[in-house]
Structure formats: structure tokens, C-alpha cells
């Protein structure tokens, strides 16, 4: 039993703001920290509302939610015990990918001679991450949609503890796959867009039509209720020349 078994936090939305009231034995002592936490949260822009919950970014759980309370508990543990606890677990579930990106961050770590983790092994890692306090489980690759057990792995994530996310190139976001992802409980995903110019994006990834398919897939995901963001490759040059800003503008235009 930990000290937090004696702390009960009730959260609600009042006037479009999230408020938390700490009870239990530790409630009075920690209320000021809870107030500070939600003061920072409420200063952020609400980018989406899902089932009465506020979403501020794709890397933290929505509030109020059970996963969000775990996120807050992690903050309190770090403050009291002076020990860092992970908030995110990035799990590379496959090295397979249809693209051959010139800037691939995974490529240096890929060894075809090594076997991929089994589903049971991945689930064990997920369990361990949740036990450590992670509130976000991200499946990456390679291309995670090339792993046929992806939906099973998404469904396995205990939604009362964490939210599941994937990073994808968008090529396999068909109507059927998006429906399966939504049914499995995928909360959000990031689609890779490397340039505001379709030709350059396709060239970077060595896949003709990749740009169009990515945005078509993004639209399907939004319609299915999956929060959808864009992941882009940035360099100091692309930032200075405004190329990254153009990608962000397209993301806003696409919704």
C-alpha cells in the first residue's frame, strides 16, 4: 500500500475549466499542488473535446479521466519522492516499412537478423511500462500497421491507465483498417508529413502517391473519431526557411 491509497481526487469541468479536489488523509497537504497542476493545465489550449473530456495535446491523457489521474499521480510522486517516473513508452513493434526514408531515425537500429518481439513479449513490456506509471503507450516501427496483431496490442492497453497512440506513414489507413483501429480503442495517431510539397514528400519516402494517401487516411481517422496529428522531419534549415511552418499550416487547413 502506498501513500496515494489515502488520496482521493475528484475532478470535474466547471466553466470550461478542469478543477480537482483532493480528499483522504493526504488531501489537505496536497491540495495546493493539485491546484497548481490544474492551473497549468487550464492555461493550455483545448484542441479537442472527447466524451466530455478536454484534450490539450496528443502526448498527455485527456482530463478528467482515469488515465489523466494517473498522470497527476505521477507528478505528485515525483514531487514527494524526488524520483523520476516515465510518462511515455515508445515500443517499436516491427522493423518492416513500405518507405525508404532518407532521414529514417529507426534505420540505424534495424537488424534483419534479429527476430521481432512476440505479441506476448510486447504485452509484457506494456505491463511493465504501466506498472512504472506510464500514461501513454506509443506503437511505432517501421510501420506499425504492417504488424497484423496491432489492433490486439492497442486493445490490450488498459484505457483506465494509459492512452494508446501510433505513428504511421498513412499508406495503410484504409476504411477497413481505420474502422478496426477505432474499434480497438486507438485514441490518437500521428501521420508523417515531411514537406508541404507532395513531390518532395514522395521523394523523401521513395513512394509515389504517399502524400495523397496520407491525407486521405487522416481524413478517415478524423471521421472515425481518432484524434489525428502530423509528425514532421525538421532541420535547422527547414525551420529558418519556413518549410516547417508551411507543413504546420497545411495541418491546420486539413483540420
Model-based region annotation:
Residues 1-87, 99:
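Flexible, acidic/Gly-rich N-terminal and inter-domain linker regions that tether
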Residues 28-36, 102-107, 164, 171-173:
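Short N-terminal helix-initiation segments at or just after the protein's N-terminus
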Residues 61-62, 96, 196, 237:
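Generic structural motif
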Residues 119-139, 147-255:
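Radical SAM/AdoMet-radical enzyme domain recognition
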Residues 82-120:
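Canonical Radical SAM [4Fe-4S] cluster-binding loop centered on the CxxxCxxC motif
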Residues 21-23, 52-59, 66-69, 79-80, ...:
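Generic detector of short, locally flexible boundary/turn motifs and exposed helical patches
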Amino acid at each position: 500500500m502506498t501513500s496515494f491509497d489515502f488520496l482521493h481526487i475528484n475532478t470535474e469541468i466547471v466553466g470550461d475549466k478542469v478543477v480537482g479536489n483532493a480528499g483522504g488523509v493526504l488531501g489537505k497537504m496536497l491540495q495546493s499542488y493539485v491546484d497548481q497542476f490544474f492551473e497549468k493545465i487550464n492555461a493550455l489550449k483545448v484542441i479537442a473535446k472527447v466524451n466530455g473530456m478536454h484534450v490539450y495535446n496528443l502526448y498527455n491523457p485527456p482530463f478528467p479521466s482515469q488515465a489523466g489521474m494517473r498522470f497527476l499521480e505521477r507528478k505528485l510522486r515525483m514531487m514527494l519522492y524526488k524520483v523520476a517516473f516515465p510518462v511515455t513508452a515508445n515500443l517499436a513493434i516491427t522493423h518492416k516499412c513500405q518507405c525508404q526514408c532518407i532521414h529514417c531515425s529507426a534505420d540505424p537500429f534495424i537488424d534483419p537478423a534479429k527476430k521481432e518481439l512476440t505479441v506476448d513479449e510486447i504485452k509484457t513490456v506494456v505491463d511493465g511500462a504501466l506498472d512504472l506509471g506510464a500514461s501513454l503507450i506509443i506503437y511505432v516501427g517501421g510501420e506499425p500497421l504492417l504488424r497484423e496483431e496491432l489492433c490486439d496490442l492497442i486493445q490490450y492497453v488498459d484505457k483506465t491507465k494509459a492512452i494508446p497512440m501510433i505513428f504511421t506513414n498513412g499508406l495503410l489507413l484504409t476504411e477497413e483498417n481505420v474502422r478496426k483501429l477505432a474499434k480497438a480503442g486507438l485514441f490518437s495517431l500521428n501521420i508523417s508529413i515531411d514537406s508541404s510539397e507532395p513531390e518532395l514528400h514522395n521523394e523523401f519516402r521513395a513512394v509515389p502517391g504517399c502524400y495523397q494517401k496520407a491525407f486521405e487516411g487522416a481524413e478517415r481517422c478524423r471521421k472515425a473519431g481518432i484524434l489525428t496529428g502530423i509528425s514532421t522531419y525538421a532541420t535547422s534549415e527547414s525551420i529558418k526557411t519556413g518549410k516547417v511552418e508551411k507543413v504546420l499550416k497545411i495541418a491546420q487547413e486539413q483540420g
